[in-house]
Amino acid sequence: MNISGTLNTLRLLYNPSLCKPSLVVPTFNDLPIPIHDSIKAVVLDKDNCIAFPHDDKIWPDYLQHWETLRSKYSNKALLIVSNTAGSNSDKDYSQAKLLEDKTGIPVLRHSTKKPGCHNEILDYFYRNKTITNPKEVAVVGDRLFTDILMANLMGSYGVWIRDGVKVSANPLSKFEKKLYNFLGF
């Protein structure tokens, strides 16, 4: 269970705009590159964003766009943040290591699941001298209640991958889409 996600989602009761993305695109292939003129670093979710859920490689249809992203942003400016690979539930970080081998991009080792790991993300980019301000970070993900909420908590640019690799049957994901439409963002 993602306690961080559950507790942070309660913030939406008094501030629903925390789940409002800066940009909405159907799939990773629709992500503009560069993402925005001010963006110097990019956080990427893994499952159903750049990879099929629970897979460790870039979705084949996205490979060309992936390489375009990698040519625009350096390895220090790209960071995969997943609630599976690199999280405290990833024993010996074996999933993180495998994902790094397959993608060539660092995977954040984090003690708190999204959206609660936002300080660890910012620390990573500050330590690598990639950014000077959270506004220079784009968070790209398929979940409003984790990825986009985290982007807004960070004061960063949130890109919602609405449909992902496959349209999710997850009830929470379906609820997020209904809420997004209801709120009229």
UniProtKB/Swiss-Prot annotation:
This is Phosphatidylglycerophosphatase GEP4, mitochondrial. Pathway: Phospholipid metabolism; phosphatidylglycerol biosynthesis; phosphatidylglycerol from CDP-diacylglycerol: step 2/2. Changing D47N: Abolishes phosphatase activity and impairs cardiolipin biosynthesis. It holds the Pfam family PGP_phosphatase. It is an enzyme of class 3 (hydrolase). GO terms for cellular component: cytoplasm; extrinsic component of mitochondrial inner membrane; mitochondrial matrix; mitochondrion. Its EC number is 3.1.3.27. It is found in: Mitochondrion inner membrane. Keywords: Hydrolase, Lipid biosynthesis, Lipid metabolism, Membrane, Mitochondrion, Mitochondrion inner membrane, Phospholipid biosynthesis, Phospholipid metabolism. One of its GO terms (molecular function) is phosphatidylglycerophosphatase activity. A motif (Phosphoryl acceptor) lies at residues 45-49. It comes from the Eukaryota. InterPro entries: HAD-like_sf, HAD_sf, PGP_Pase, PGPP1/Gep4. Belongs to the GEP4 family. It comes from Saccharomyces cerevisiae (strain ATCC 204508 / S288c) (Baker's yeast). Its main location: mitochondrion. Phosphatidylglycerophosphatase involved in the biosynthesis of cardiolipin (CL), a unique dimeric phosphoglycerolipid predominantly present in mitochondrial membranes and which has important functions for cellular energy metabolism, mitochondrial dynamics and the initiation of apoptotic pathways. Required for the stability of respiratory chain supercomplexes and for growth at elevated temperature, in presence of ethidium bromide or in absence of prohibitins. One of its GO terms (biological process) is cardiolipin biosynthetic process. It is a peripheral membrane protein.
